[in-house]
Design a protein with these regions (language model features):
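Generic low-polarity alpha-helical segments
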Residues: 34, 65, 166-170
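Generic beta-strand hydrophobic packing signal
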Residues: 34-35, 83, 162, 176
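Acidic surface patches and DE-rich sequence motifs
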Residues: 38, 87, 97, 193-195, ...
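Cysteine-centric segments in proteins
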Residues: 136-218
Length: 218
């Protein structure tokens, strides 16, 4: 059974495009919360299951921690663009963007990483919405987009159809997709659409599917 997606209800501000992007990020990686915070520590928007006030406080505190880290004189720390902090009860990821903006993500329990595909998609969409340049360190993940896939009735890890241009598009499996970016528990395929386009599909550990350079999204 597919997990129920989070919603934008129970908020203390009107939903924005930023909130929708962060909501999808939370759903993609199972995160309890995610927030976009500006250089002054103000939360632009957020998503998650926590109280909005708690999300705002956490976002401001971690944005300050990221700023302090980037201001220190230790070699390699001042240009940190991605920081993971693991605590006894909660863990967080801090993602630096242009002009002092940052994404603060509370990680799923016992996790110390986040899907680079989900993160790359969120960064791309947030930067487009905010008029920011995508950081160079995330350009390599710019081609991945989360998609809906109908799995084979014989094997849920094998794709049968892709939701494409308003309908289910049958897929022709050409072979396995193998690359260093595949993590433990992930499986990839090279597929052909009925349009003749060939794309890479990856199923991540949480059952989310991602397509690389899908024509309708590029």
């Amino acid at each position: 059974m597919r997990p129920r997606q989070r919603t934008l209800t129970g908020r203390d501000q009107a939903a924005s495009a930023f909130g929708g992007i962060l909501l999808k990020l939370c759903d993609s990686v199972g995160a309890p919360m995610a927030a976009l915070v500006d250089a002054l520590g103000e939360t632009v928007d957020y998503a998650g299951t926590h109280d909005p006030f708690d999300i705002r406080v956490a976002a401001a505190e971690w944005q300050l921690a990221l700023r302090e880290l980037q201001a220190c004189s230790i070699p390699g720390w001042h240009d940190a663009h991605q920081v993971f902090v693991r605590g006894a009860k909660r863990s967080f990821a801090l993602i630096a963007l242009e002009e002092g903006y940052a994404i603060v993500i509370e990680l799923v329990t016992h996790s110390f990483s986040v899907s680079h595909r989900a993160l790359g998609e969120a960064i791309r969409e947030l930067c487009i919405e905010a008029g920011l340049k995508v950081p160079q360190s995330y350009v390599a993940d710019d081609g991945w987009t989360r998609v809906e896939v109908k799995p084979s009735r014989f094997d849920e890890r094998k794709p049968e159809a892709l939701w494409f241009s308003g309908g289910w598009c049958p897929l022709e499996l050409l072979g396995r997709y193998t690359n260093d970016d595949l993590s433990t528990g992930e499986v990839g395929f090279r597929v052909r659409l009925i349009t003749g386009a060939e794309v890479n599909l990856v199923r991540e550990k949480l059952g989310r599917w991602y397509a690389e350079d899908l024509p309708m999204f590029r």
